[in-house]
Amino acid sequence: LKDASSAAVYGARGAFGVILVTTKRAAGERFTVRYDGSVSILSRTVKPDMVNDGLQWTDQFLESYRNCYGYDPTSINNLFAFNNAWYEELKRRDADRSRVNEAGRYEYFGNTDWDAAIYKKSTAAHQHSLNISGGSERIKFSISGRYFSQDGIYNAVNDWYNQYNGRVKVWGKIRDWWTVESNTSFVNRTYRQPMSYSGKMLVQRQWEHQGYPMQLITNPDGSWTDAAVCVGVAGMQTDRSYQHNKKFDMTQNIAMTFDLMKDVLQLKGDFTYYYNQSERDRKEAIYDFKNGPELPSSRAAFDSLEQKYFNNNYMAGNVYLTWTPRLGDDHSLKVMAGW
């Protein structure tokens, strides 16, 4: 809500808008237990058509480059060397996707499907929720909880998301004119995501810059290629670089209502406490690769571990009095004052 009524009830804080959260209250004296669960198989709704043929990709790249600059490039995106001899060899090759040139460096002539290397075809998710409620005329309670888990979309050793949340709500009538309500909730989330050798760059950007189909993921001797390290496939498949995100939220609200004069004068008060804790652990490792059988190299320059912690506490209270005098059937008046 963001209008005059929210400002009237919530004062200065109401000017920034008020979010009203309504949760279920147990009805009647029946004790109820309810379970709900599901299992899902998920896949991407939109999958781009990728050019995975190295020669076709190179032809299109050359056409674009020549139309822009009027001459042939000396490299493709500054890491992949280009010359006419390599281009003619790319046309000739089909079965053997790499060779060692006179300088002892690998040259690649691949048709790599980077989309399949980076993304899973489908992922699985499941959720389970439980609700217990009951009570009597003077006291009612509701306890609910939910667990949700989903695998990530990356073709990685560890890529997943887990969430736990719960709520306990109690309503009690201490006297006919005095009611108390407590609402406690929490949410705990954990996300484990793979990282490349440098977590400052998105996988999609690295893929666009270095993941062209002529590149290979591994060399003939099984070592990683420079492209596999740059794009992040090496990090995903070895699980040596990752980011672990944790977030916990807890909210406690206690409210009291006093009917000083039934249907005429009512006093309400509430107190809310909110606590949030966030943690992030990021680990980035050095990856070895080979530019040739006898040309080992690595990225990045060093291993790193970054840990961040955030804590937030928030408290708010409200007290307001509502006067609704009886003015007959044709007239009404409502006066509200609060702090």
Q: Where do the language-model regions lie?
A:
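Outer-membrane beta-barrel initiation region
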Residues: 120-122, 132-135
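Short coil-to-beta-strand
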Residues: 137-143, 291
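Residue-level signature of outer-membrane beta-barrel architecture
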Residues: 23-25, 134-136, 172-173, 256-260, ...
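A generic structural signal for short coil/turn motifs at secondary-structure boundaries
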Residues: 7-9, 118, 152-156
